[in-house]
UniProtKB/Swiss-Prot annotation:
One of its GO terms (molecular function) is DNA ligase (NAD+) activity. It catalyses: NAD(+) + (deoxyribonucleotide)n-3'-hydroxyl + 5'-phospho-(deoxyribonucleotide)m = (deoxyribonucleotide)n+m + AMP + beta-nicotinamide D-nucleotide. The gene is ligA. Keywords: DNA damage, DNA repair, DNA replication, Ligase, Magnesium, Manganese, Metal-binding, NAD, Zinc. This is DNA ligase. It comes from Neorickettsia sennetsu (strain ATCC VR-367 / Miyayama) (Ehrlichia sennetsu). SMART domains: BRCT, LIGANc. GO terms for biological process: DNA repair; DNA replication. Its EC number is 6.5.1.2. The lineage of its organism: Bacteria, Pseudomonadati, Pseudomonadota, Alphaproteobacteria, Rickettsiales. It comes from the Bacteria.
């Protein structure tokens, strides 16, 4: 049978692509191409139910993580692509319900991220699973716990509650990462790390969008209000309406604003707002009847790939870049597209001179989808070089890594350019007026060979002015901006060094812990022989072996130590200070037990903003223990060591304007 043969082929395709998408985090085709295959498969299944092929959802959970069975299946959504299909879906749904009156929908953005299902028992997070195959997912609870603002404990909820949502990376964060093809893949790769410290550095975000049954909640819109009231992040961009013109107007509005939204959206989801109707509508084999996804059209165009050039990143990652014959897509002129890595280049067999299909679908960087082979004549296969295009050093590629790297970090001109570009960025020294072209010029002419040379440029003032394009005013403005940027906080200085895995958040925590540059640098210089300092770093909330290894690798190199010392001699590094009264400045806190009126994450933020430091384990160096309900062994240990105990109420009073929390000595050890 022809139908059976086609269904079998489509089924095998879906299995392969689901594995690439859900388990490998490296999809080979676009969402639009996947949707086309899946829609064709489902239509053939409906027309040939006797053939007995299964509906494909997700992919079995990886063996790397513990498995979690979902309370109810995590289904996918059927798609529509036009107003006509929307009207047809609404009418079909009303016929199913035998409903004559209007049917209200809640319209929400469809985030292009990674789905999760978090389970709470008696208000405490006990598991958090990926979609997996829709029935069983991977337990990523440790990684979810480090996502900023994700509740670990919640109050006033059913004894058993399952909250679902989407984890994503915003565009700004994605731009700081290397080696990922798009924000969705980066989010998936970050969320499925075996080391939560790496996840912590990636600044993942999330939106919660549904919950299991809650007494008294009757509408989807109320579910979002309920979740928001208990500390979950929900997307404020939504509309409740029963009118197709209003729904389409909202769809068009979000679509037009898509490029201004700081995260990827690939459509809207329309959900029947009345939760009582969800049970009546039930589900299809792979999707609920009470919801549908209205996908955005992708922006695509064909153009000639004129050249493949290699870009060298700050950490040495080599990225192939397609230089295109300029083409306008969605009102934007596109002349370049990332080819991501050597594997991607080989898999798609992309060659110089090819006619390629380019897509700009809300991603930060346009992507080359595929090659139009019918146009190809005698183009030669692109051979990925084994030498760095900037310094000619031999490139290396570690096992199980997609990235190819140049390890000549100190002598590779392009890496030095990117390192100094990082140093002068707004998040570091914030030196206005110095761009890539300026840095390249300074390096080429020998004015800069290391970061500290930026602050020695005034010695070359007269020489710089002799070159074409360098007028008196432009040179003086740059030198003035450099002079005005010499004063820098300790956390920004640490971040400016570009140490692997040391982002802004980690730099702040290190500054908070070590207070002054002298103290921090002394401790880092002796880190390889100082297990006490290593333990001190590991014990900081959100830190661990990954951060320690990065610091150890960096400061084990005497050239790096000399570079930091040289840079520090040309700037003024201010000690870490907190400007909220300073009442908790330098005080170390440990939490134990369950907080009732605020979440533990909120309490941590209160302490950090007031200059305090949150650590994970009890020692003689701890100043306070914040004890909630059902406090455990940490409370007993605190009593043994004579550490002051703070009740939740006392901490709340402090946030309302009181000074340092009143201390009390606990005698109980429950």
């Amino acid at each position: 049978m022809e139908a059976k043969k086609e269904i079998q082929e489509l089924y095998e395709k879906l299995l392969r692509h689901n594995k690439k998408y859900y388990q490998d985090d490296s999809p080979e085709i676009t969402d639009a191409e996947y949707d086309s295959i899946k829609d064709r498969y489902l239509k053939l299944l409906e027309a040939n139910p006797s053939l007995g092929f299964p509906v494909v959802v997700g992919y079995p959970a990886s063996e790397k993580f513990q498995k979690v069975k979902h309370l109810s299946p995590m289904l996918s959504l059927r798609n529509i692509f036009s107003e006509e299909e929307l009207v047809e879906y609404i009418e079909k749904t009303k016929r199913f319900l035998n409903l004559k009156s209007a049917l209200e929908f809640l319209c929400e953005p469809k985030i292009d991220g990674v789905s999760f299902s978090a389970r709470y028992v008696n208000g405490k997070l006990v598991s958090c699973a990926t979609r997996g195959d829709g029935k069983i997912g991977e337990n990523i609870i440790d990684n979810m716990k480090v996502i900023n603002g994700f509740p670990i404990e919640i109050m006033d909820v059913p004894d058993l509650l399952e909250v679902r949502g989407e984890v994503f990376l915003d565009h700004d964060t994605f731009q700081t990462l290397e080696g990922f093809s798009n924000p969705r893949n980066a989010a998936a790769g970050s969320l499925r790390q075996l080391n939560p410290e790496i996840t912590n550095e990636r600044n993942l975000q999330y939106f919660a969008y549904s919950a299991s049954k809650i007494d008294g909640i009757e509408h989807q819109e109320d579910v979002l209000h309920f979740l928001s009231g208990r500390g979950f992040m929900t997307n404020p961009l939504r509309l409740a309406s029963s009118k197709v013109p209003e729904i389409m107007s909202f769809y068009d509005s979000v679509y037009r604003r898509r490029s201004q939204i700081k995260y990827d959206i690939d459509g809207l989801v329309y959900k029947v707002n009345d939760l009582k109707l969800h049970a009546r509508l039930g589900t299809l084999s792979d999707a609920p009847r009470w919801a549908i996804a209205h996908k955005f059209p992708s922006h695509r165009a064909k153009t000639i790939l004129e050249k493949i050039k290699l870009s060298v990143g700050r950490t040495g990652i080599i990225t192939p870049v397609a230089h295109l014959k300029p083409i306008t897509i969605g009102g934007v002129v596109i002349s370049r597209a990332s080819l991501y890595n050597e594997d991607e280049l080989e898999r798609k067999d992309i060659r110089e001179g090819d006619l390629v299909i380019v897509e700009r679908a809300g991603d930060v960087i346009p992507k080359v989808l595929e090659v139009d082979i019918s146009y190809r004549t005698n183009q030669e296969r692109f051979i990925f070089p084994d030498k760095c295009p900037s310094c000619s050093s031999t490139l290396i590629r570690k096992n199980n890594e997609a990235a190819t790297r140049c390890n000549n970090s100190k002598k590779c001109p392009e890496q030095v350019i990117q390192q100094i570009k990082h140093l002068v960025s707004a998040q570091a020294f914030d030196i206005d007026g110095i761009g890539t072209s300026h840095i390249s010029f300074f390096i080429e002419k020998g004015f800069i060979s290391e970061p500290a040379d930026i602050f020695r440029l005034d010695k070359h003032r007269d020489e710089i002015k002799k070159y074409d394009g360098w007028g008196e005013k432009s040179v003086e403005n740059i030198l003035k901006n450099i002079k005005n940027s010499r004063k820098i906080s300790l956390e920004k200085f640490i971040f400016s060094l570009g140490i692997k895995n040391i982002g802004e958040k980690t730099a702040y925590m290190l500054a908070q812990q070590f207070k002054s540059f002298a103290n921090w640098f002394d401790k880092m210089s002796m880190l390889k022989d100082d297990t006490q300092t290593e333990d001190e770093i590991r014990n900081l909330d959100g830190m661990g072996s990954c951060i320690c290894e990065s610091l150890l690798d960096f400061f084990s190199d005497s050239d790096n130590c000399n570079m930091v010392k040289s840079l520090s001699n040309h700037v003024m590094i201010t000690d870490h200070t907190v400007n909220i009264g300073g009442s908790l400045s330098g005080k170390k806190f440990v939490f134990t037990g369950t907080l009732l009126s605020i979440t533990r994450e909120e309490a941590k933020e209160i302490i950090k903003k007031a200059g305090g430091i949150v650590v994970n384990s009890i020692s003689k160096q701890i100043d306070y223990v914040v004890a909630g309900e059902k406090a455990g062994s940490k409370l007993a240990k605190a009593n043994e060591l004579g550490i002051a105990i703070i009740e939740e109420k006392t901490l709340i009073e402090f946030t309302n304007g009181n000074n340092t929390p009143a201390l009390k000595k606990e005698t109980s050890s429950n």
